[in-house]
């Protein structure tokens, strides 16, 4: 996020920050029920992401680099949860909460495909593929984020 590869300790610290911000406020989860079941998941995600600012008004000053970093951490941490919940809602299944002991890709797969009655066995190949998808997506968004300010 700072234009260079992190040290091992910086990487570990970043991963912990992300893992500790994966949950959504329960009131945000209620927003999903306002969407039709056949709404496109991307439309749901856009609505939910927009609603986040009403819950995190403590860090909305885009002129403050620390606020931008906090917002970046939050959106990176919460986006898999938001996306998985949009998917679960669209297919009529109960939401599955994040499990922070899992890595980023595995957690996303878990939230998408586990159910309250059946644990999802994560396929290592799918996990690797999701990692490969998430890397360029997050890099692209972060680079766009950096150039806006």
Model regions and ranges:
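Conserved small/polar residues in nucleotide/adenosyl-binding loops
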Residues: 140-147
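Proline-rich low-complexity regions
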Residues: 6, 25, 79-80, 144
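Short coil/turn segments at secondary-structure boundaries
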Residues: 2-6, 32-40, 66-70
